[in-house]
Amino acid sequence: MATAGKVIKCKAAVAWEAGKPLSIEEVEVAPPQAMEVRVKILYTALCHTDVYFWEAKGQTPVFPRILGHEAGGIVESVGEGVTELAPGDHVLPVFTGECKECDHCKSEESNMCDLLRINVDRGVMIGDGKSRFTIKGKPIFHFVGTSTFSEYTVIHVGCLAKINPEAPLDKVCILSCGFSTGFGATVNVAKPKKGQTVAIFGLGAVGLAAMEGARLSGASRIIGVDLNPAKFEQAKKFGCTDFVNPKDHSKPVHEVLIEMTNGGLDRAVECTGNINAMISCFECVHDGWGVAVLVGVPTKDDVFKTHPMNFLNEKTLKGTFFGNYKPRTDLPNVVELYMKKELELEKFITHSVPFSEINTAFDLMLKGESLRCVMRMDE
């Protein structure tokens, strides 16, 4: 492309400080360096993680910053050493990478790349410790190696999944974080068998994606657990057969669930990050074969407390990161599930706005009115 090797000026939504509305600014995006790729973003979605680090409550504030990590785009140019991607390729940026060379990447059991694992505090490129974004010469920090709230961004090649160019980027863009995290937690880690019972704790976008995994796995009963009763109606679209609000019961929710299922759930997936929900998720599964999977991220001071007899009675507790998907290896296959109409991504996308209205997307999520709001970069 004619822009290869040159600085590109484009629009980006800059977070200048915590909790303040994002500002659409003209930024300069430098060419990609070794093992980097410059991507033209066509669609980007808002994930709760973006909101979390924009609020910066209890987090290291890294500002000014370009947030965003769920997106779909096209390769504009590649840096030295990049052989797997070429200009014109369709890609999904991912907040965690796959170098394909470390012990984790070589292991069939792990997706936690040593080199490119998520780093929320690093606001620069891993290669040279510098930003590729500037405004009038002043550096603007990156976010989790992706920074997709920009018409162009620079990303390490290991954090880009090359996908089928026929796949609609305005739909499959949501696969690059939340959906895959929840869906993979069920199908790759909990692995319910056809006819089994599954409980999902937390019915936000990640929880509903986990529920979709249970539905496609043929679960006979899917119990949604949430403190907001308004979420049950929406959850029915994702296969939810029963709804439990812990506030409606005088006894602990795990006891309620054990009674409902004649001894406990076959599988349970926790998607809230609340430590009490995590413990309940484990304690509600059936002894002998029950499997609980933790997806939500707890606070740094949380401690998981349960009686050791739960383990001796052969209940299994697992954790997962990004649904146990290796980004470059596995995401193209998840895209193909959508192309074969086995995944229904449309029901997760509740809103769509032009990129210029990005603050509307933040408002919708803060009010709890959206699952995913996709922003169109060309408007």
Curated annotation (Swiss-Prot):
Q: Could you cite one Gene Ontology molecular function of this protein?
A: S-(hydroxymethyl)glutathione dehydrogenase [NAD(P)+] activity
Q: How is the cofactor bound?
A: Binds 2 Zn(2+) ions per subunit.
Please give an example of a GO cellular component term from this record.
Answer: cytosol
Q: Which InterPro entries match?
A: ADH-like_C (IPR013149), ADH-like_N (IPR013154), ADH_Zn_CS (IPR002328), GroES-like_sf (IPR011032), NAD(P)-bd_dom_sf (IPR036291)
Q: Which CDD domains match?
A: alcohol_DH_plants
Q: Which UniProt keywords apply?
A: Cytoplasm, Metal-binding, NAD, Oxidoreductase, Zinc
All disulfide bonds of the chain are none
Task: Give EC number(s), comma-separated.
Answer: 1.1.1.1
- Is Metal-binding a UniProt keyword of this protein? yes
Complexes and interactors: Homodimer.
Q: Which family does it belong to?
A: Belongs to the zinc-containing alcohol dehydrogenase family.
Q: Which cofactor does it need?
A: Zn(2+)
Location in the cell reads: Cytoplasm
Residues recorded as binding Zn(2+) 1, renumbered to this chain, are C47, T49, H69, C177
- Give the reactions, separated by semicolons, that this protein catalyses: a primary alcohol + NAD(+) = an aldehyde + NADH + H(+); a secondary alcohol + NAD(+) = a ketone + NADH + H(+)
Q: Which Pfam families does this chain map to?
A: ADH_N, ADH_zinc_N
User: Its principal location?
Assistant: cytoplasm
- Binding of Zn(2+) 2 occurs at C99, C102, C105, C113
User: Whose protein is this, by species?
Assistant: Oryza sativa subsp. japonica
Specify whether Metal-binding is a keyword of the entry.
Answer: yes
Q: Which GO terms describe its biological process?
A: formaldehyde catabolic process
Query: Where is NAD(+) bound in this sequence?
Result: 49, 202-207, 226, 231, 272, 295-297, 322, 372
Which of this chain's residues are annotated to bind an alcohol? T49, H69
Q: Can you say what this protein is called?
A: Alcohol dehydrogenase 2
